[in-house]
Curated annotation (Swiss-Prot):
Organism classification: Bacteria, Pseudomonadati, Pseudomonadota, Alphaproteobacteria, Hyphomicrobiales
Binding site for ADP: 154-161
Name used for this protein in its record: Putative pyruvate, phosphate dikinase regulatory protein
Protein's job: Bifunctional serine/threonine kinase and phosphorylase involved in the regulation of the pyruvate, phosphate dikinase (PPDK) by catalyzing its phosphorylation/dephosphorylation.
Family of this protein: Belongs to the pyruvate, phosphate/water dikinase regulatory protein family. PDRP subfamily.
């Protein structure tokens, strides 16, 4: 198949489950290509020939790359045959990985659709973490901070809330507390013994940019607001760094990090800490 010209193309994601795996993998790959914008077509819960018929009709109407996570052999064969017929490249995202596992383990798969979404202990742990995190967002209910796995602190717009939610989705109970010059931090934060406290920092220039975008999004004129004043923001950052050093909190610069990268760094810190605390 000859490569397409231009920056836009159709990307068809066909799944017999939620489609989350396909979305995550495809977006990670697309991010490696500059000026490329796929038109995503997501087809979740495709589990019958009739459902697949509708998907194939749409793919034929707007051909492009087809990625899929289907376990039913008949569905896979039909999808691949149709893609070959219309000259659309197709690839099973989990097929090669399953083959590798099967060869190494010498065991067949259970073939259960959506097995990763089973209501097991991990699922309920994530739900519990999400409930806790939502209840302890932005300095709420500080009396329960000791029950957290991780407590994030930082000045405004250091991605505390989205990072907290991301961690909660990984089963990590996360609270976050804003650091504001002139306002004392909660006494509970100063006396924590169990949670990992991580202080998020960003360069003043980055904070100003994010804050300006925030003001624009809510239709507020900045004026001479200290919220985006260069010196005021620099003073905030200095205050947060000094306070973090005083309390020996882990400090993490998020200036050039995405939410996912920040969360990954925190998860590693948390895992390392858990291992250190385990008795030998």
């Amino acid at each position: 198949m000859a490569p397409i010209t231009g920056s836009n193309f159709h990307l068809h994601l066909v799944s017999d489950s939620t489609g989350e795996t396909l979305i995550t993998v495809s977006r990670a790959v697309v991010a490696q290509y500059a000026n490329v914008t796929p038109v995503e077509h997501v087809y979740p819960l495709v589990r019958s020939q009739k459902q697949l018929d509708r998907v194939l009709a749409e793919i034929e109407e707007e051909p492009g790359i087809v990625l899929f996570t289907l376990l039913e052999k008949d569905l896979v064969e039909r999808l691949e045959a149709k893609c070959q017929e219309i000259n659309s490249p197709s690839l099973s995202i989990i097929g090669p990985v399953m083959q590798l596992f099967q060869a190494y383990l010498g065991a067949a798969t259970i073939g259960r659709v959506g097995a990763q979404h089973t209501l097991n202990a991990d699922y309920f742990r994530r739900i519990d973490a999400l409930n806790y995190t939502m209840m302890h967002d932005d300095g709420q209910h500080v009396e329960g901070l000791e029950e957290a796995d991780v407590v994030l602190v930082g000045v405004s717009r250091t991605s505390k809330t989205p990072t907290s939610i991301y961690l909660a989705n990984r089963g990590i109970r996360t609270a976050n507390v804003p650091l504001v010059p002139g306002i004392a931090i909660p006494r509970q934060l100063e006396s924590l013994r169990t949670p990992l406290v991580v202080s998020l920092h960003a360069a003043p220039e980055r904070l100003i940019q994010v804050r300006q975008n925030r003001l624009l999004s809510i239709g507020t004129r900045a004026g001479n607001d200290t919220y985006i004043d260069r010196q005021s923001v620099a003073d905030e950052v200095t205050y947060a760094r000094r306070l973090s050093a005083k309390h020996d909190w882990v400090q993490l610069d998020v200036t050039r990090r995405s939410i996912e990268e920040t969360a990954a760094a925190i998860m590693k810190l948390f895992a390392d800490r858990q291992r250190q605390r385990q008795p030998e």
